[in-house]
Amino acid sequence: MDSKYIRNFAIIAHIDHGKSTLSDRLLEMTGSLTAREMQAQVLDAMDLERERGITIKAHAVRMLYKAKDGETYQLNLIDTPGHVDFSYEVSRSLASCEGALLIVDASQGVEAQTLANAYLAINNGLEIIPVINKIDLPSADITRTQEMIEQAVGLDATDAIPVSAKTGVGVPDVLEAIVKRLPPPTGDPNAPLQALIFDSWFDAYRGVIVLARVMNGTLRKGMRIRLMSNGKVFDVESMGVLTPKPMEIGELSAGEVGFFVATIKTVSDTKIGDTVTEDARPAAEPLAGFEDIKSMVFAGIYTVDSHEHTLLRDALEKLRLNDSSFFFEPESSVALGFGFRCGFLGLLHMEIIQERLEREFDLDLITTAPGVRYKITMTDGSTLEVDNPSRWPDPSEIEQVEEPVIRATILTNEEYVGGILKLVEEKRGRQQNFEYVTPTRVMLTYELPLNEIVLDFYDRLKSVSRGYASLDYQLAGTWVSPMVKMDILVSGEPVDALSIIVHRDFAYERGRALVSKMRELIPRQQFEVAIQAAIGSKIIARETVAALRKNVIAKCYGGDISRKRKLLEKQKEGKKRMKRIGKVDIPQEAFLAVLKVGEDSASKN
């Protein structure tokens, strides 16, 4: 097909603003699916995607649309994840397009992720069509939403298209706007091949399936291709397009989007953002914008039943086949046995992996408190990167610690600003910007340590704002901070799985809260149990779980006091001996207490 009849576009929106529903309507109206094949959220194939109402993986669907001008156009919809953890995937998906539909909920207005993804689209030079969705809701306010789009995003919203993706009202106008307002792709089909990988997944029968947008040249079946980031060479076995059912074709030329299967065995070879070129006639340089995805959040994952350790390893390897952005390595803990240290893109990514392990592989898991990666400069001038408290060096050898920092954008209603400011200050935030987007809607920009975000920030932000605040963030460098490792000792023995890295100024209250929480959770023993929080050799907080005592003087009726004293002394000696040799079993809830401490201190405020 002539490239002037091709339109490549993405749909960008905040979670729950109706992106997947609009995609369904477009598929229905272009006749890509029969009524029988239609089901809600066609493109969200994973159960988790449907349940949480989020898109986790990118998808690409080809539709044929006969426009009012009588021509048939090929529309390639690239469905992108909306969540901040997957923003690199979004940026690569957007780089595959010439235009984007910016969907805004008419009742909620512009949210933080709408903004973040809209800026990504603008930076990629895309033509943006604003679409105001959910106009069938009684609380819909089209005029106010247009004003918000103009003020917050800086786009002209006078010709924004009002639609209801649920009922189908206004959707034909969206199709016409895609054809009329979005530019066709540019690219020379005869130039050396350059194709951008924007997603890949593993199929048990065919190996790795790669989604790509051909920028220049033509990709053909049987061609020997080379991946430009690692120089690996593969043969293309088959290729095609998703309509959304896979349909095999012989070639993809400049401007087209489709999938190909080559002799690739692992997803880690096909990095998102990489450039595919022909081995015999390679392109002079790769497409711009490729980055290696780095894990941001780290946690230990262990099985409740230590015999299931090998099952956990197999499950993680299977998940890694489909998700090269998360990594794991074996680690062992005295308290929890054998497990794995895992790295994730963010908190949602961690939750999704954990839920998939429990749901798809039927495993019972314990997850340790999530942490981040610190850069440590030692007194001898060398540097270390540490993401696990157990590898924290001796404090006397540390010169300085740098912690990762994020730039957070929070959009909220003005009545909740006070509570949010208090929360952000508590989390060591530094204000960058404060502006009114509309008379009642405020946009706050803060720099915050990632370490403070990973535990409970999002939940607390939602509770402070009664669910009306939305958050988006990206990495913004590092700060030098006095971070220390805090150990929890039970009966004088450090429990490695409970160690955490904290800011020195907050160590005392964090330690105090943690040991008092542990005191409630560790069952009473026959001997007293000391629970201590320590930084190095210095104890900063202590609680004691009192011993269970039998009433040894119950059998004494009257008589001399020395008889009773003798029995009590004898009991005390026995308890002392027990304490020396006794072992304390720490229940699973105690490990989860590390995660909950912040929430409890918040609910008391």
From Swiss-Prot:
The alphabetized list of GO BP terms reads:
positive regulation of translation
Q: Where does GTP bind?
A: D16, H17, G18, K19, S20, T21, N133, K134, I135, D136
InterPro entries on file: EF-4 (IPR006297), EFG_III/V (IPR035647), EFG_V-like (IPR000640), EFTu-like_2 (IPR004161), LepA_C_sf (IPR038363), LepA_CTD (IPR013842), LepA_IV (IPR035654), P-loop_NTPase (IPR027417)
Question: What is the catalytic activity of this protein?
Answer: GTP + H2O = GDP + phosphate + H(+)
Q: Which UniProt keywords apply?
A: Cell inner membrane, Cell membrane, GTP-binding, Hydrolase, Membrane, Nucleotide-binding, Protein biosynthesis
Q: What is its EC number?
A: 3.6.5.n1
User: Where is it predominantly found?
Assistant: membrane
Listed SUPFAM superfamilies: EF-G C-terminal domain-like, P-loop containing nucleoside triphosphate hydrolases, Translation proteins
Q: Name one GO molecular function term.
A: GTPase activity
Describe the task this protein carries out.
Required for accurate and efficient protein synthesis under certain stress conditions. May act as a fidelity factor of the translation reaction, by catalyzing a one-codon backward translocation of tRNAs on improperly translocated ribosomes. Back-translocation proceeds from a post-translocation (POST) complex to a pre-translocation (PRE) complex, thus giving elongation factor G a second chance to translocate the tRNAs correctly. Binds to ribosomes in a GTP-dependent manner.
What is the protein's given name? Answer: Elongation factor 4
- Native source organism of the sequence: Acidobacterium capsulatum (strain ATCC 51196 / DSM 11244 / BCRC 80197 / JCM 7670 / NBRC 15755 / NCIMB 13165 / 161)
